[in-house]
From Swiss-Prot:
Residue ranges constituting the ABC transporter domain according to the UniProt record: 12-253
Gene Ontology terms, MF aspect: ATP binding; ATP hydrolysis activity; ATPase-coupled phosphate ion transmembrane transporter activity
Name listed for the protein in its UniProt record: Phosphate import ATP-binding protein PstB 2
Cellular location(s): Cell inner membrane
One GO cellular component term: plasma membrane
Amino acid sequence: MSMATDVTNSKIQVRDLNFYYGKFHALKNISLDIAKNQVTAFIGPSGCGKSTLLRTFNKMYQLYPEQRAEGDILLDGQNILTDKQDIALLRAKVGMVFQKPTPFPMSIYDNIAFGVKLFESLSRADMDERVQWALTKAALWNETKDKLHQSGYSLSGGQQQRLCIARGIAIRPDVLLLDEPCSALDPISTGRIEELISELKSDYTVVIVTHNMQQAARCSDHTAFMYLGELIEFSDTDTLFTTPQQKQTEDYITGRYG
């Protein structure tokens, strides 16, 4: 299904994307545009393909040889699905934060510095500045500035997830992918992450997968509803939640199934 938006404002353009887990056809003819410096949410019931779609944007599936994508995904006009794509550089441009907080088994400081060192050779002073910048962007600096050399595991769950966001933006990507980033967090921590998502779009293109429709409504500018591997509806968030065009969308957001 084709649901393109304004191409001139697109960071990612998906065209006729099909995805397979072995012989299982998980994504079916997906076409949509992800707008620059906006938050796009993917919603739908479990197994609908929303996380699969998200993970095609940085080719996470390449870790598993039985998985494959067909079609086109253009990032700034370049098709990332070609074999010529440098995976390391792609994942530097397209950062990802997972469902459960995944701090590295190292200090808070080194959690941030680790990825930066893979792509840049910074002086200690410049690295200190980058670490502070990333933690500040992730609304974590004031809580960690006096314990940067303590383990990342010493932080609370909500703090660990913000640490993962700081780690993701420290390498200065263009796009930030968030796969159910609040599902393991308490309501207060969730609120802080949602505030952070709204702030991050001034610098990044953000794509979030969420089971929480209220979260999608609060955080996103555009929302895609998926069902059984198909893109059912894609529009600006207010329109999708107030005047959905497809009965399947209306049934889902009103709780008739899901």
